[in-house]
Each structure stands twice: as structure tokens, then as C-alpha cells.
Amino acid sequence: MVVYDLLISGGYLVDPVNSLEGRFDVAIEGGKVVRVEAEISRHLARQVYEAKGYMVLPGLIDTHVHLTPAMRAAGFHMLAAAGVTTALDCAGPVETVLEGMALNGSGINIAVLNRLTPGGSLSSEHAPKDEVRSYIKKSLADGALGIKLIGGHLPLSPETTIAAIEAANEAGCYAAFHCGSTQNGSNLHGFLDALEFAGNNHLQICHVNAYCRGLTHGSPAEETLLALKELAARPHLVSESHMGPLNSCWSRLNENGIPFSHVTRTCLTSGGYSMDRKGLLAATLDGYMQVQRAWPANVVYLEPEEGAAYLKEVDFETMVSFPVNERSTAYLCATAKNPEGGFIVNALSTDGGAIPRNFLLSHGLALVRFDALSTAQFVQKTSGTPAHMLGLSNKGHLKPGADADLVVVDAERHIPLLTVASGQIIMAGGAVMGRGGKLVTTDFGVNSLTDQNVDHEVANLEQGLFYKAPGGLSRMAG
């Protein structure tokens, strides 16, 4: 008699949330894990995946990705191909993410943070708190999980930045911060400002490694140790870091012919290039700057000559990358612990998605091979803790009753072989066959998403690590 939709047979399961590690079979029915036992009869399943010799992990949860604009919707497939089953889009807007999901969804779960942009979603860098509140209210009603401050790229004043963090906490939503303001940019000073701006409010500090490039103290390692010390003193803040050697920023130019993004400006000047068309083209031709091009199925880096030609073709309206992320900084942020033995930076992320650096498995398992992390710690930082951050208690583990989100991994080659989301195979052998997806939202977004027939689930942020992390406000202010 057939009982289960799918059986993952013979794999080596690593599930630190439930203290399970060893050879187990996993039975899936109706989008849920229903049995985890040493041996389950293959005859009970409609479909069997033989995982002998491979690892079976809870689906990866990436707490920092980018999936917009819709022309970069290939990011949905890129995530599924990398073993990711849930991701936090850190820009939005939610309507554009939904457009991309409809065009090229891969069956994964997506939460969205709508970004605060001076001259865009906000009137200016000095927007008053009431205006920020109004934008947050609209964003949540549209289905967003919260907001993203992008002060490193497009800074707000310190006053508006503080107001936004406070308003998000008052609304009980999620908030993340690419550190920087009109006071200090995307560097260690901007990072330290962000910690002060947050006060006792709750906040996700994005890509901690990105503020430690030697711009303020000359030594990336010294800056990283200082950043980790200050972050460890504020356990109420959640954080993530990534391991990609390249950053990502816009090459778009403003009316004065200067890059919109302050990060792009800094990278150009740090490399000895001018902050204009000439500098962008020269940096590309020299191989210092790599130009990204989005195709329907992928986003790729172009060779120098091709990249320069593409910049001209699209009038610099694309994304570019610079080799500014130090390996020492990536290592320290991924592995550093506090005196109690917990990780200072909660999660490993990629800042990937539609940016070609979805390195959770490839680089994360390299840390395992290096004995810098155990496999269980890797799973903790890429699935268990991220699920807790986002208030998704049925994800990040594979206990019976949990959502059937998992990945089968070739640990020797550091690659995913099978990605399963909500009990459906969405990637096998590198081929993505998943479609659509599910939006992770708050109670405020349910009506709008229901009216649009968008599949969704509500995160329990109040019980998640974002609001339960020790040391901050004891409850949401709203």
C-alpha cells in the first residue's frame, strides 16, 4: 500500500535542531515530513530517492538575497539550484518579487523586505517618521515581511534612519540594515553608527563582513575583530555574513554622471578610478570591475571587452562587482564565537539570488572540510538559526510535522543533488523543475495576497529570534 509521496532513502541526515545525525530515511506526505527512521520500506512510497553516500540536510535558508528587478527573475532558479528552499529578499518591492515569481518561480519560499530609498519610496534622506510609518504600513499590507535600509548605497540621515528602525519595531515587522547613513558610509564607522542607531530595538545587521575592508583602520582583520567585539555586546541584534569574494552594486549614473550607489563610488576610488563613465569603463577593461548580465535562466559575469560593450549598450543600467571582500574577514565572521560558545554572527548568507554568488554549500562546506565548522554547525548557520530568525518554526529542521524542505548534498563535491520544497522536488541533478512559490508574510499581508491568489504563509515574528533575541526590548512596542 502506498502511503508516502516521497521517500529519501539511505542518506546521512544532519539535523542539529533535533539532535539527529546519522543514517535515516525521511518520508514525506502532503508537503510535510511524516517519518524519520533508520529504515522505512521503499514499497510505501510513490517515489524513492536513493541518497546513500550523500548528506540529507534541512533546506537551506538564505537570509540575504536579491531577486529584483523582474528581469533578474533567474534568481529564483539560481537559488533552487543551490539548494535553497527559503530566502529573504532584501530590497523588494514585494510586487516586483511577485511578478518575478509568476514569470520564473522555482517553488521556493520568499520573504520580502521593501527598501527605503530617498527620492523613491521616501521623499528625501530627511523624511519624517510619519512618512516612514506610512510606507511601512503600505509595505506590510502589500505582503512584505518588513523593511530594508540601504544606507550603504543610498543613505538616509541619522535621524530618519533611527526613525525607520523605531517605526519597524513599533509595527512588529522585520527590519534589516546595510549599514551607512549621511554621517558615515558602508565601512566600520557606518557599522558602529548602526549599532548605536538601533539602541535597544531589534534589527538585522546585513553582511557584517562588508564593513571590514580596511577603509577606516587599514587592516580588514583588525576592523573585523573590532566589529565582532561590538556586535557580541549586543545580542539582541541578529546578523549574517557571506563568503563571496566579489561585492555587488549598481553602475547606474545620476544626473551628474556619478554612480548612484555610494558603494560603487568607494570601490572605484579605492581602485584608482574616477567616479564616472570613463572610470567604470576603465575598471571593466582592466578586469577590476566585473559586469553582470541577466539572462532568462541565469545571471553571469561578462569578460572585460564584452562587459564594457554591455555597459554602453544599456547606458550603465546594470549591476557590477568588485573584488573587495577579504577572505580573512569572511572566515572570522563565519566562525567567531562569544564567550558562551555561541556564534557572534548568527547566520551564513550569500547576498546572492540573482547575483552569481550562491555559495552557501560550496563555501560553507569548505569551512567544514577545513574543520572551522562542524557539519551540524554549518546546518545551524544556514538553516536552523535562519528559520528561527524569520519566525518559521516548521522550517530549519526535519522533525515529523515539519515542512518538507530539504536538500541532498554531495559533501565531497560541495554541491546539491536534490532540492525539495513543500514536499515537491524542485531541483534534481542541477535541473530546476519547480514552479511558482510561496510568499512569507505577516498578518497584515494576508488579505492582499489572498485577493491575488498568491500562496503564502504567515511568519511568527513575535516568537522568532528577531524579537526574542536577548537584551533588547522585551516585547514589540506596537
Residue ranges with predicted function:
Residues 151-232, 239, 247-249:
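Functional cores that coordinate and move charged inorganic groups
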Residues 59-65, 87-89, 110-114, 147-149, ...:
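Hydrophobic faces of well-ordered beta-strands that scaffold small-molecule active sites
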Residues 1-24, 28-29, 38-39, 79-80, ...:
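Active-site microenvironment of metallo-dependent hydrolases
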